[in-house]
From Swiss-Prot:
InterPro entries: Neuropept_B_pre, Neuropept_BW_pre. Disulfide bonds: none annotated. Has an effect in food intake, on locomotor activity and has an analgesic effect, (in vivo pharmacological studies). May be involved in the regulation of neuroendocrine system, memory and learning. Belongs to the neuropeptide B/W family. Residues 53-119 form a propeptide. Residues 1-21 form the signal peptide. GO terms for molecular function: G protein-coupled receptor binding. Coiled coil: none annotated. Keywords: Cleavage on pair of basic residues, Neuropeptide, Secreted, Signal. Pfam families: NPBW. This is Neuropeptide B. One of its GO terms (biological process) is adenylate cyclase-inhibiting G protein-coupled receptor signaling pathway. The keyword Signal applies.
Length: 119
């Protein structure tokens, strides 16, 4: 059951659209980010020797996925999305975002590298 939840969480993360490049870090190793994005961008400027070691299990998400743990073996797992079939009858309009809907979908994944290369 936990493996199924992990795969569903990974599939949902893969379905999110890529973020727009709104920030270009300044050249040079001594640049420090300030403001809203400083926490997000701080890892770009760290040297490998100063990085914290990874924890054995990383808690992911809030809401229904808040108890989901991703172990290091699952985080490095290569998977590809074979097919996504949205259930249009389950779509609900998001109140805080204009023109955005949240829908349930059937997501078909593959853990085999050969399946990922054939698409």
């Amino acid at each position: 059951m936990a493996r199924c939840r992990t795969l569903v969480a990974a599939a949902l993360a893969l379905l999110l659209p890529p973020a727009l490049a709104w920030y270009k870090p300044a050249a040079g190793p001594h640049h420090y980010s300030v403001g809203r994005a400083s926490g997000l961008l701080s890892s770009f400027h760290r040297f490998p020797s100063t990085r914290r070691s990874e924890s054995p299990a990383l808690r992911v998400g809030t809401g229904p996925l808040r108890n989901l743990e991703m172990r290091p073996s699952v985080r490095s797992l290569a998977l590809c999305v074979k097919d996504v079939t949205p259930n249009l009858q389950s779509c609900q309009r998001q109140l805080n975002s204009r023109g955005t809907f949240q829908c349930k979908a059937d997501v078909f994944l593959s853990l085999h590298e050969t399946d990922c290369q054939s698409t």
